[in-house]
């Protein structure tokens, strides 16, 4: 007689073994209809799972994150079934859940076309409407291999060979299609109501370029049609905001094949960069950081000491000269420790905060590169704080204040926070970890921040806090981080003299707010759709004349604005004013100033905002005050 304990603390007793679906029906018919799976003693299972002993059970529906993952996983199988029906010669390989959807890789004699995707999606809709039951079975390993070989699915047979011997081999069948899978799956295809195939791309089997190129079909799936429609609308908006397109359109930057993963910054884009960098530099000064500069290339001996040569070598660019091996730095921390080590420090010198806009390079795979968001050459607002264990809490608390001020000024008001704690394999004593984790948690609470705890997700050398921004489209971007490090200071011999005259290793805090400058500028461009706020805009105002008679007046207006520290340009071309207004409006400039005969005679300018608002004519001094206010208020 199993006793089932539910999340609300109540219990239900059954006369014999009972499935998750039967428990859901016992609770209520509505819950039974909504059930997608269950969690038995914390493990996700199908609704057909048979519970034989006392257990904790929660029913998974589409309101749960696990429910959405089950929907997406099951939709990947629906895709595979449709492909096999339409293209019987295709072989199925793997089909995992990814962010916002899923993909499935197929081996086929030719690439799938957009027309193929339309047919496949239509077949998926038909299969979903049929509400086909999805049935789980377990096979012996040899039997499963023989089965997949008999139906020509060699990839599935190969996958079984890589499954650990102590894991059972489970298969899921829906009508004429059977796939190898651990689960969990929806009880029937009728639960899959909102999905769309997005694109097809190439992908190597097992990610190895020596293997066959497969066809990867990407899709998205949601619990409700409204959710799918909202996601597709967000993608449309994101397409309009694509920083790669805006970078060229607004003359900010470009990238080219001769320098993969590197950025060519144009004058306008470099202005934005400089404004962000100078803002962060001012923050460094305000919060007591000292700016430094470390070499871009260092001898392999340094990287061997730090452990990068052994553990990160494939991601490093290396070179040789005069029989010595060198590496281009992928990160700044070893260099900062060298500066710390150059002087003998007392405990009175701590905390010591060293900051650098450090130029780093990482040999990212070419397929992973994506505009400014994933590059090979990047600059970080990197800083390292050398402190004692007792100083960690206050340093982290101050960093959080600094970070939130910066994000607010850049226009990000919603920040998600995660605290990652000790993994199984780690350096340092339990006492040190206890103290460090508590310091981070207290610093977060001190700043009244809610945070998600991620047990076991810290690095082997210390716990960390991650800060994730939500942009204007609701997308999440992990940017800020502060990471404790018990390991590297000891490994590279960083020491200070304590009160008792003994030598101790400092705690090292790795911290960044914007992270990669390139990536952060990409995020800013997309967040603002290229319409940068006045304080960041490369051109804050464009002054236009109506006829040649105002050319000198326009020049004097430009001179006065520049004297007040503004970034201003003029357009004196002999074109219709409507043409010039339209052209410069496409450049998303904060203000257009129009000078006609009347404005020239009265010392005024006619002001238009980039939103198309006509503010009318005003004295130049009034506009100067308006723009000063915009810049000061970071709008």
From Swiss-Prot:
Its cofactor is Zn(2+). One of its GO terms (cellular component) is cytosol. It catalyses: tRNA(Thr) + L-threonine + ATP = L-threonyl-tRNA(Thr) + AMP + diphosphate + H(+). It is an enzyme of class 6 (ligase). Binds 1 zinc ion per subunit. Keywords: Aminoacyl-tRNA synthetase, ATP-binding, Cytoplasm, Ligase, Metal-binding, Nucleotide-binding, Protein biosynthesis, RNA-binding, tRNA-binding, Zinc. This is Threonine--tRNA ligase.
